[in-house]
């Protein structure tokens, strides 16, 4: 079983914010897939299954406690692989990077996952840039002129993610799909 986690915050006030690009990518995948909804309160998030071996998770614990949801799903399904999609303020909007393991880079959602599940998982890092005030920047909505770039990056990321799921070769996917901005 492969678990793909899209990080974000629940609630209308957080929709279309920079911190929610992980949720946005999961939603994009669900739009184009036949899925089974496995959402259950014990998973502390929205959980979907595509095919026989792919789980998509949107934690409902808020960003800083994402690990609670990830651990609940991972413990129940005994996933062989985990891929986490998240915003990254250290790379510009329009950029895309891939990584396995390492530090959380100050990202509280990753810190929570690392604490409860370890850090040996693949990461899809979607650049959102760094504003003057980090918190208001990541919790802020994309400007209209940024939405075109965001849409292109999400489509590109979707292709990369689907290939990563199939091929399990992070280095090759990184070489093929990483974007600079």
Swiss-Prot record:
GO biological process, one term: rescue of stalled ribosome
Sequence similarity: Belongs to the PTH family.
Role: Hydrolyzes ribosome-free peptidyl-tRNAs (with 1 or more amino acids incorporated), which drop off the ribosome during protein synthesis, or as a result of ribosome stalling. Catalyzes the release of premature peptidyl moieties from peptidyl-tRNA molecules trapped in stalled 50S ribosomal subunits, and thus maintains levels of free tRNAs and 50S ribosomes.
Broadest EC class assigned to this enzyme: hydrolase
Chemical reaction(s) catalysed: an N-acyl-L-alpha-aminoacyl-tRNA + H2O = an N-acyl-L-amino acid + a tRNA + H(+)
Cellular component terms per the entry's GO annotation: cytoplasm
Active site: 19 (proton acceptor)
Sites marked Discriminates between blocked and unblocked aminoacyl-tRNA: 9
EC number: 3.1.1.29
Organism: Campylobacter jejuni subsp. jejuni serotype O:23/36 (strain 81-176)
UniProtKB keywords: Cytoplasm, Hydrolase, RNA-binding, tRNA-binding
Alphabetized SUPFAM superfamilies for the sequence: Peptidyl-tRNA hydrolase-like (SSF53178)
Name this protein carries in UniProt: Peptidyl-tRNA hydrolase
């Amino acid at each position: 079983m492969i678990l793909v986690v899209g990080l974000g915050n629940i609630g209308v006030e957080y929709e279309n914010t920079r911190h929610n690009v992980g949720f946005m990518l999961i939603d994009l995948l669900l739009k184009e897939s036949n899925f089974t909804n496995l959402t259950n309160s014990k998973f502390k998030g929205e959980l979907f299954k595509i095919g026989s071996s792919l789980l998509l998770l949107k934690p409902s614990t808020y960003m800083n406690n994402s690990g609670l949801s990830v651990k609940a799903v991972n413990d129940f399904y005994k996933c062989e692989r985990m891929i986490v999609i998240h915003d990254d303020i250290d790379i510009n909007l329009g950029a895309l990077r891939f990584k396995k393991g390492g530090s959380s880079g100050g990202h509280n959602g990753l810190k929570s996952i690392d604490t409860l599940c370890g850090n040996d998982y693949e990461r899809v890092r979607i650049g959102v840039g760094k504003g003057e005030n980090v918190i208001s920047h990541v919790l802020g909505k994309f400007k209209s002129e940024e939405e075109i770039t965001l849409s292109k990056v999400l489509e590109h990321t979707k292709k990369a993610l689907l290939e990563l799921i199939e091929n399990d070769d992070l280095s090759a996917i990184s070489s093929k799909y990483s974007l600079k901005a």
